[in-house]
Design a protein with these regions (language model features):
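Aromatic-lined carbohydrate-recognition surfaces of secreted/lumenal glycan-active proteins
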Residues: 1-13, 35-38
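Histidine-acidic metal/acid-base catalytic patches
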Residues: 15-34, 40-117
Length: 117
């Protein structure tokens, strides 16, 4: 079994909102990262979290406009998915699509597959 910590958007109850905070929490512990793309985008920290990609166990995929955690379909917000996926070169784990409904999930799946092809 592999345990992972998820990066979270800024809130009074979040521990791991920055790459540095997440790295410090994991220091010396055999634990992975559940990388949430949308959460990182709300903090403007996608590139910083990509520096920790060797510890990614899975990736939560959704888009937003950069201010709040909207769970928009892939390609409908401000996440630069081609750049993100380029930064994930060599990643072989799971992508978990997060959406507000089935139609949005299917749309995200199609777009993600297109980008990964």
């Amino acid at each position: 079994m592999k345990i992972a910590l998820e990066n979270m958007p800024r809130s009074p109850f979040s521990m791991a909102t920055t790459p540095q905070a997440l790295s410090e929490l994991m220091d010396g512990i055999d634990i992975g990262i559940c990388f949430d793309v949308g959460h990182a985008n709300t903090m403007g920290l996608i590139d910083g979290f990509l520096e920790l990609k060797d510890r990614f166990v899975n990736i939560h995929v959704h888009d937003n406009m950069g201010a709040t955690d909207e769970h928009l379909p892939v390609g409908k917000g401000t996440v630069d998915f081609p750049r993100l996926l380029g930064g994930l070169s060599g990643y072989s784990g799971r992508y978990v699509i997060e959406s507000r409904g089935v139609d949005d999930a299917v749309q995200s799946q199609r777009e993600l597959r297109r980008l990964l092809a």
